[in-house]
């Protein structure tokens, strides 16, 4: 009886590694978003229950403690969890970058606040975009999609196997980073153009009426223009990411056969 309990505990520990690694990068599963680390650990523990019998049947615990092979097992699980979390966190990082860029252009970078979603200092628009994306993520079934990827990863990459750092892996990471910056620019570009035009108009106004302090109402004017532009462009804001996400499958198909 004691041996079976130990085997189940070892299987639970192995099953817990991959979701824990995923939560370290995915903003929605961080302790700041869920309220406390204890609550986050409870959520992650519940995510491991569906795959716990599968890991127990693989008898991985027979190899634990006999040599140092468990180090490779833990490293492989961490790499897989980080890879899934990195892909899922790209949109959240991109909208936070877009918000910080817009606040920099409108001169409101001193109003930074703590964003519990990404657990870092962010701007006002960055927090707004992050909360908006969280709502869209849950409404559109993004969390279900992430869980499907997590559980299907155990079918293609069971514990003991890991991803290879080959040329296809580098191409995939390069595509992810390129999409991160493209999504940031495409998300904030309409508002950037409006603010540049507003700065040009205020500059011409200052040349014609030098007694008028245009900097006094430049920030409120640009803030209103940014909000109006974003309200108009929100339906098309994440379209670029949906288009680019189809290209990810091409890199995944080239990468996974080498595993």
UniProtKB/Swiss-Prot annotation:
Write out the GO biological process terms.
Answer: protein targeting; protein transport
Pfam name, any one: Bac_export_1
> Topology in the membrane?
Multi-pass membrane protein
Q: Does the keyword Transcription regulation apply?
A: no
Transmembrane segments annotated in the record for this chain: 9-29, 35-55, 78-98, 127-147, 185-205, 214-234
Q: Name one GO cellular component term.
A: plasma membrane
Q: Where in the cell is it found?
A: Cell membrane
Q: Which UniProt keywords apply?
A: Cell membrane, Membrane, Protein transport, Transmembrane, Transmembrane helix, Transport
**Role summary:** Part of a type III secretion system.
Give the protein family. Belongs to the FliR/MopE/SpaR family.
UniProt-recorded name of the protein: Secretion system apparatus protein SsaT
Specify the species. Salmonella typhimurium (strain LT2 / SGSC1412 / ATCC 700720)
Q: Which gene encodes it?
A: ssaT
């Amino acid at each position: 009886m004691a041996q079976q309990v130990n085997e189940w505990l070892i299987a639970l520990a192995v099953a817990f590694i991959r979701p824990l690694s995923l939560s370290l990068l995915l903003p929605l599963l961080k302790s700041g978003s869920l309220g406390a680390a204890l609550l986050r650990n409870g959520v992650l523990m519940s995510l491991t229950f569906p795959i716990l019998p599968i890991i127990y049947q693989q008898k991985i615990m027979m190899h634990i403690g006999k040599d140092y092979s468990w180090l490779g097992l833990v490293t492989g699980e961490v790499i897989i969890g980080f890879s899934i979390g990195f892909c899922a966190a790209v949109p959240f990082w991109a909208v936070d970058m877009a918000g910080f860029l817009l606040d920099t252009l409108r001169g409101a970078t001193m109003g930074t606040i703590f964003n519990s979603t990404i657990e870092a200092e962010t701007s006002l628009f960055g927090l707004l975009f992050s909360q908006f994306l969280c709502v869209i993520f849950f409404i559109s079934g993004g969390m279900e999609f992430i869980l499907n990827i997590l559980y299907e990863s155990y079918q293609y990459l069971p514990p003991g196997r890991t991803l290879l750092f080959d040329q296809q892996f580098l191409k995939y990471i390069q595509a992810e980073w390129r999409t991160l910056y493209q999504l940031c620019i495409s998300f904030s570009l309409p508002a950037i153009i409006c603010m540049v035009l507003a700065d040009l108009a205020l500059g011409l106004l200052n040349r014609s009426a030098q007694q008028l302090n245009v900097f006094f109402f430049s920030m409120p004017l640009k803030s209103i223009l940014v909000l109006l532009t974003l309200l108009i462009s929100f339906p098309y804001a994440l379209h670029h990411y949906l288009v680019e996400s189809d290209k990810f499958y091409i890199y995944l198909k080239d990468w996974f056969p080498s595993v």
